[in-house]
Structures are given as C-alpha cells and as structure tokens.
Amino acid sequence: MIISGKYVIEKEIGKGSFATVLKGYIIDDNDNNGNDTNNEDVEVNDDKRKYTTRNQIAVKAVPRSKLKNKKLLENLEVEIAILKKIKHPHIVRLIECERTSTDFYLIMEYCALGDLTFLIKKRQEIMENHPLLKSVFKRFPPPSKNHNGLHRAFILNYLQQLSSSLKFLRSKNLVHRDIKPQNLLLATPFVDYHDSKSFHDLGYVGISSLPILKIADFGFARFLPNTSMAETLCGSPLYMAPEILNYQKYNAKADLWSVGTVLYEMCYGKPPFKASNHLELYKKIKKANNTISYSNDCEIEDDLKDLINALLTFDPNKRIGFQEFFDNKLVIEDLSKYEVANEVYSELELKSKSVLESNMFISEYLPSEKKKDDTDNMIISNLSTNDRINNITIFSNILPTVNENENDKTNDNSTTNYNNNDNENNDNNNTNHNYNNDKVNNKSNDNNEKSDINRSNSNYKQHSTKQTTNELIPNTNTITTNINDNSNSEMNSQSARMMQKSKNYKSLRNNKLRNSKNDIINNSNSDLILEKEYVVVEKKSVEVNTLADEMAQIGQINNLNYKVPYPSRSPTLAGNVLQNNESLQHYQPFSVKSPRTSLSSNGSGNSRRASLVDRRLSISSLNPSNALSRALGVASTKLFGSNVLPNQNAGVGNANNINTSMPLLNPQVFQDLTENILLRVDQLQGKDRINIDSNSIVQILESLAAKAFVVHSFAEVKFSQTIPLKSLSTSTVNRPANDRRLNDRGCAIEEDDNIQTETYDTYIPSLKGRSLSSLSQTSICSQDLPHGELYQLSKEAIILYMKTLSILATAMQITSNWWYQSNEKNCSLRLNLLVQWIRDKFNECLERADFLRIQILELEECENKSNELNSDHTDVETSGVNETVHNNDNDANEEDQIYVEKLLYDRALEISRTAAKLEIQGDHLNNCELAYATSLWMLEILLDDRIEDDNFNEFSSKNSAVLDDQDREIIKKYIDSIANRLKALREKISQGGS
C-alpha cells in the first residue's frame, strides 16, 4: 500500500488500541515511475528492493474512526505538534504527518533494534541470535549471569544519551512524563557515520559502536516551565514519581525520578520498586525512606549509587535538580576509552548494514518471537492507559488480567509494539517495542489492565466515564426494573437471584483470572503488573481525593487531642445531639448495646424508634439504609479507628472512673447520622442553593449526599442485573437457614451487600481497561440475559453512575471552595464523615462505570461480529430502500434515547406506589417511610438546575433532557403528594401504627 504516492507500507510490527505501526520505506523516483498514485492503495513488488539506511520508516496509522471524541483527537494533535517542533539526534524523528479522510499517518524514524527492554529482558536470546548485538555484547559482556544488568559502557552510554535528550526537552520547557525502558528506542549504529568523529559531529553523544538511544512516545508530553506544577496523573506506575502516585502536584523533576528507575534497571535488570498496584508501590517507596536496596549479585561503583540515590529521592524538593544532573561527573564522563579499534569498527559496520538490508526487526531474530509470529501473524495485544479516557483513567486497584485462549499467549509479545500502550507481559516475553503513543485507556493486555474511563462529549453511542468512561453507546428501548415486592415468595425469589448474581460476579472474575496464560500469583508476573500499566487521572479526581485526605488528616489530629469521658447513662443522647447541633464538633460517646438489640432510654417509657440498621428493608429494590450505613462506617473506621468502644461492656461504675482518649464515632451515632441524611428530606430539600458558610455547609452536603445516594442505589440495582446469573439449580430452599431470608424480617439486601462488598472490590479492578481481544470470548457472549437487555441495562447503569458522579463532584467543589476560603481549618465530625463518604462513593462510581464501559464495548463487538456474519449470508436486494431505512433508524434512535431524568422519574413513582401499597396493607411502615423519602429525593434531583462546573457536564449533557415548565409543575405536584403521604405516615408511626 502506498501513502501519498511516496510511502510504501509493508508488514505490521505493532498494534495498539487506536493505532497500528508498520514498517515501510520511502519511494524514490525510480520506484514511482512518474505515476500519480496519490492516496490510492497500490501493491508494490519489492521482493528485490535493496533497503538503504535512508529510506526505511515506521508508519503509525491511526484510523479516524477510533478517535471518537474530541479529547482523543487533541491528544494525537498535541503529540504531532510536539514532534514537529523538536529535532534532536536522541529523539525519534517525525518525518511527516499525512492525513486522509479515514486515517492519520505518522511517518516516523525507524529503529530496527527495538527498545531498551530487549537488551535487558531478552539479552540471552539476543546474544545468541542477533549478528550485530552478538558482537557488541561480546565486546561489552554483562557483569553477571545471575541478573539482567548491563555492562558499564552500556549504562553510561545510555545515561549520557538520555541526559542529552532531556536537556534539550528542558530547553523547550517540555516534560515527557513517561520515561521508561519501553519508550527508549534503539537505532542501528553506523547509519550516517563511519567513525567516532563523524558520530559526534552529527550531535550524538556516548559510544559510537553501541546502538543509539532515542526517546519515543510523546503522547503524555506537555509544555511545563520549571516554575509550573502539573496535576494530571499519567505514565507507567513502576517508573512514576511518588508525588504523582500520591495524587500531588508535580513539576518537571518527575522525569528525573523516572531516569533514576531506568538507571537502576540498567544496572540490575529490574526496577528498584515493585508492587501489585500503585498504592502498594507508593507505600513501599515511602517506607524505604530514601534507602535504595542494591543487590549483592552485582557490585556497581559508588558514584552510580550516589546518582541513583539522588534521582530516587522521595521529596521532589530534595531531589537532584536538572542542572546538577546534567553536570554530574558520570553524565559528562569521557567514554572514548570504550571506543573500539578500527578493524572492529569495520566488522561492526558491515554487520550493521547487513541487519539493515535484511529488513528484519529485532524480534524476528529471536526464535521465540518467530514462533509467535507464525501463530499470530505478528499481532500484539494492546495495553492502553489509562487513557486516557478522556479526562479520566482509573488509577486504583490495578490487577492483572488474562486471555483464555491458548493462542492468546502469543498476542502479548509477538512483535515489537510501537504503541506505548503495549509493553512486555513477563520477564521472559518482553519484546514489545513502543513507538505509538496512543495511550487509549480502556483496553488492556493479558497480564495487565488499565483503567481509564472517558467522560467525553461523544454521541450516545459510547459513553465516557478517566478519573471516567470511554464513549458509550447507541440507544435502545428503555427497560424499567420491576420491583418484586408484592409477596414474600416473590421477595425470596428476588433475594435468591441477587445473592446468586453476587456470587457469580466473583466467580466470573475468578474464571477469567484462572485462564491467564501465566499464573498471576507468580511473583515475577505480579512484579510486572505496574510495569505494563499506564495511568492518567485528571484534575477532578485528584481534587476529590486530595481534599478528602486533607480533611481526614485534620480529623485524626482532632481525635488524638480530645479526651472523652463517659456520660452518665442516656443512650438517646446522640440522637438529640445530632438533631440539635448541626455543626457537631465533639460529643460524648455513650454505651450502646449490640446493633441487633433495641435500645431504650433508662428507666423512662420513652423508647426511640429503631434505627435504619435495625429496621431491615424488605423492599428488595431499595438498598439505601444498610449500604449507606456500611459505607459511612468504613469511612469512619478509616478516619478515627475502630468504632467499637473498648469498654462498652463494662459496668457503669467502671465507666465513670474512666477518662481516656476515645474514638469520636460509635455505632449508634453512626446510625443516627445515616437516618438523618435520607429521612430528613423535608428539612434538607433546597439546602444546596443557600449561601455557604460554616453553619450551612453540613446541611448542603447532606442534601447533595442524599441525592447522590438515591441515584447511586438505583445504579447499583441496574448494575447487579448485568452480572451473569448461573442457573439456580440449588434453590433457596436448599440453602442453609442462615444463608437465606426466611421471613419478612430477613434482610436479603444486607446479605447481598456483604457479598458484593467482597466481589466488587476484587472483580471490578481486574476488569478495568481490558482490551476487547481479551474479553471477546469470555463472559458477555455467554450472559444469561439477551444481549439487547444486557446492553440496555449497562447503558442505563452507566448513565446513573455518571449522574451520581456529577452530584458528588458538585458536593466536593462546594466543600473545596468553603474549605480553602475559610480562615479556620476546623471541621466537624459529621462534615468529615460526609466528605469521606463522598470520596468513597466517587471512586466507587468510577470503578463501576469503567466496568460497564468495557462491558458495553464488548457487547458492541459481539454485535458487530454477529452482524458481519449475518451480512455474509444475506443478498443485497434492498438497495432501493437504504435511504428510507437509514432515516427510520435515525428516528428510532431519537425515540430510544435514554435520559437520566426519565429513569429517575419512573423509578421515583414506582417506589412511591410500592410504598403506598404496603402502607395500605399496614406492612413495613418504617420501610415505607424510607421509600417515600427516597422517592422525594429522586424527584427533587429532577428540579435541580443542570450542573455546569464539573468534569462530567459534557457527558451528562448528552443524556440529560431539558424539562419544560409543564414537566416541572407535574413533578412538583408529585412531590407535594408524596410529602403529604410521608407526613401522614410519620404521624401513624409515632402513634404506634408500626
């Protein structure tokens, strides 16, 4: 194939999420023969072509169809713009960029020797099979056979070449942000020079007889002056600076940390820090306290250790600076002593030209890679970042994933990948060479997964959720979820189904992991998880987590400095305090009985209503009480330690003699706080629009938290229905009595929550960022639901999660404005607890949305394959009506568009009607109260003005309907009606009607 009449594309050498990289060459006048081929695809007979040093190229082809939103297109344009501006001998050169109506073609400098990982991970095979590198390693043998470290000549050569390129980038105020061995390409030596003098005259540094290092992949690069700080989290975790891992702002010094990790790996053949996820990695780095562990297998000089220590300094302010690095004696050391003799020069030059003329990429010399090429036709699985999904790539809970086909084993490393999304999958199979910077989050490799969710403005064919989801999807008929609450038998059936689905959710994940071509429990594989990971996290997620961490830290300090005595004896104290003190700062804990026992006031006949934790829900589709309680409980435990009082079983006499530092939170206060958020709907409605000050911030956040919670609960119902359900051959009757709901006081939801707490936390992270190739033959194609229904449910769930994220982002923005404008950094316990809950839900929704995004893409892939198969057996006899059909499809899409307003409206009315039926029957009045409150919150959301200042607005605007005045009036009437019912119900409950 010929591009623009002068570039011939040959075989593929790499493939990524959005781009394919191919080898090629530039046509000279004799090849073209004066024919105007322009953009036509022309086959060229090049069997007898003699490849020269000047005509070989690498072509990165990016189909426009893959760039489905503006952000992804901008990322590519930024890379092109940067590469056009920079020309340096140790940076991969962009020769030209060609654009057609269907594709972008980046014509780039070709590096035939792969990347630095080949010399480290594949050294033994290279020494045996590659003619040029065999001679080079013979001249500079590795220091030890026990590890993959390189000879000092290699180390200093590449250190100086890397330093030279970074010095140039800093002169242009550029920061690369993804320095790692996979992005350090190696070009064949002796291409434009014949001796050491001509080598240096061309601007090269180092040793002329060694492969030449060139920095590639500027997809994460950006202009960043020395005094500026960046907030976007990106790069590969194993090589990422700790300040980025910890969501902090960072400057160009982050690149120096990456240089330190690369330098260490060249010395010892492995990164300095390894972990199974980025959080553990950060903990290890911090725990090391600037003490780097050096292996006894190989001794390196003290100067190298000192430089590594200076580069791998935890605090960026204490880390070595660029100028000091550039002036380091190792960086400026004269390496002429490593230059070879003239006769050796001639031998190496002949072998170098032979390699070039053979037109063979480095992986083609390796026996293991040749075998893979025969099996897979040189196709590699793609690892993508986090993309970047547009503005958000999921950054947490990175776990390995798998291919279940035996043949998929070859997909990971069959060739060198010019896409920076593709990296080695294990220590012995690392041949992926990164040229392509299309770090498109949302697809992943077998042993490695990326998060990335995209929130973008794309049409409703693919939704985006990075820090959130890549574009979402077309539209189909809305499906409302029926509430099975008309009878106990129906509720038992629904309960069994939900529990079975939760179990299958975990089972599905385990099955996929079980099919991995390498045992993920193997230490060597787990060490590489992060090495293959890309991460991009945009500002909104960083702000949410940073603010929550700051407030949590202050909460801990307040807790440590406060001594709390036991009170006299009133277990109802907390409820009164919460009701009367909105800005609760400190209060006295009280002794409480087990959460399963009822509480009464001491001695008085005044008994308080059972808390939501005690009043188990029997409406199966409602899940606010214990879920919110559990979430808040987890947050409070993280903040203030255990919420169980050490001496709660002690007698009152003993308690009176104790005056010690106690946790500020205990179970009863926790339950009261949970109740107030949802059940105080009449007090909190409209509070999010009042002026913000220290007295009103809690009410504002409670209002927004309640709104976010009811939408999130609805999303969870939809989400649970997308989990594959195995046949219920073992009915609930056969299950142990303690594993099923026996009567109307049983709590199926509570049991499900216990299961889901485990399964969601372990399953979703392993699915994030997975490539379609690794998913296409797994769960989705064998779901118990029809594809259409599953597709619809996934779409509805992701819309609801995005709405939740929008509300939570607004809550955190309001909190941030108040927090940083306030003179006092003193927050109440309740406020702190709310912020932690909002943060937890925010991160959880990102994970759910990422999973759904992958599932949606997977379903679309299955559907496309099915359509292709059907089209092969269908005669084309309807050409005359194509236009009519197309128009009808467009009309259908308009009618089938899913709007979050309609989902919430239908759900609110459904809940209130169900509650009304139960109220008439006199059953579960406390749960009816909760149902009415939930319905009111949902309707209240519909009257809110659209949120304009959060990162999810673009996404929301595509699936949000504009309500006219008539719609609003109808909603207000329903609110008034339901509020009256709620008021009457509460009077009935207070009179003992429950």
Curated annotation (Swiss-Prot):
Residues 403-478, 590-610 are annotated as: Disordered. GO terms for molecular function: ATP binding; protein serine kinase activity; protein serine/threonine kinase activity. Pfam families: ATG1-like_MIT1 (PF12063), ATG1-like_MIT2 (PF21127), Pkinase (PF00069). It is a peripheral membrane protein. It comes from the Eukaryota. Keywords: ATP-binding, Autophagy, Cytoplasm, Kinase, Membrane, Nucleotide-binding, Protein transport, Serine/threonine-protein kinase, Transferase, Transport. InterPro entries: Atg1-like (IPR045269), ATG1-like_MIT2 (IPR048941), Atg1-like_tMIT (IPR022708), Kinase-like_dom_sf (IPR011009), Prot_kinase_dom (IPR000719), Ser/Thr_kinase_AS (IPR008271). It is found in: Cytoplasm; Preautophagosomal structure membrane. ATP binds at I13, G14, K15, G16, S17, F18, A19, T20, V21, K60. Residues 455-467 have a biased composition (Polar residues). Its EC number is 2.7.11.1. Residues 412-445, 468-478, 598-610 have a biased composition (Low complexity). Residues 7-331 form the Protein kinase domain. It is an enzyme of class 2 (transferase). One of its GO terms (cellular component) is cytosol. It catalyses: L-seryl-[protein] + ATP = O-phospho-L-seryl-[protein] + ADP + H(+); L-threonyl-[protein] + ATP = O-phospho-L-threonyl-[protein] + ADP + H(+). Its main location: cytoplasm. PANTHER family: NON-SPECIFIC SERINE_THREONINE PROTEIN KINASE (PTHR24348:SF22), SERINE/THREONINE-PROTEIN KINASE UNC-51-RELATED (PTHR24348). Belongs to the protein kinase superfamily. Ser/Thr protein kinase family. APG1/unc-51/ULK1 subfamily. Homodimer. Forms a ternary complex with ATG13 and ATG17. Serine/threonine protein kinase involved in the cytoplasm to vacuole transport (Cvt) and found to be essential in autophagy, where it is required for the formation of autophagosomes. Involved in the clearance of protein aggregates which cannot be efficiently cleared by the proteasome. Required for selective autophagic degradation of the nucleus (nucleophagy) as well as for mitophagy which contributes to regulate mitochondrial quantity and quality by eliminating the mitochondria to a basal level to fulfill cellular energy requirements and preventing excess ROS production. This is Serine/threonine-protein kinase atg1. It comes from Vanderwaltozyma polyspora (strain ATCC 22028 / DSM 70294 / BCRC 21397 / CBS 2163 / NBRC 10782 / NRRL Y-8283 / UCD 57-17).
